[in-house]
């Protein structure tokens, strides 16, 4: 099956692995790209040396295309932009900011630019400044989120722009991927399920929290004060909840406390395994993720599962024709 995304990026499967900070390193992204998807390194707030090491790792594993996710509010953003150009990275996804400042340089270097968008307005703006595609990510996703669900966002973005759309947020199996394609997406991005891939270096405690999660086990923190984040409930999310309640009672709340509480929280969970005091970012679909598999097994399950579901539904609807 071919889409504009598989053709544009020269990948076998129309499936992206989300560029999750601290999780999406060279081992994971390399395994995904090697297996035919698009592996994406999570740049996060990492310095140039760390991202370079991950790029080197991928290149040692495969010669297939891969991407780097650049957080545009990172203090090292200029260095990372220079790096991806120097290293001839084929794809850049962006978040937390406007990539227009770098668009010309990216395109001159032959880099495909795919921003993550939480709204139709931002998708249109990205198309206008020259984005090659957009990732429409719904609030079901883990980590930093917007306000629209995947079903409402993807369909409206696909109807509003002419560039390809990648659906993200709440997708972890073939049925979910099929839904994304039916909404008009030409690829899907998956995060939470890849966190527990066998090639993922996320701490075993972090993986265990996802594997044990139920459908109701994630919550949103700091949605009224700061940047909303979805994570699995733990002591940190309860502390955030209390801080928000206290802030509502104050005429001029100190919002700095939310930045302090969140600083280093993801690394604490992913790297050090503190899944009570750290931030266990995961999507609402975590309740459907029940086992560790290789990146290749995950890709094939998503791809062939989507094909099976679409074919089943097509056969059900065969012969239905509007005659009026």
Language-model features: locations:
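Active-site entrance/lid segments in N-terminal catalytic domains of soluble metabolic enzymes
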Residues: 1-160, 164
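Active-site metal-binding loops of divalent metal-dependent hydrolases
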Residues: 20, 170-171
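Conserved active-site-proximal phosphate/metal-binding subdomains
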Residues: 151-162, 166, 172-324
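Conserved acidic functional residues
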Residues: 116, 169-170
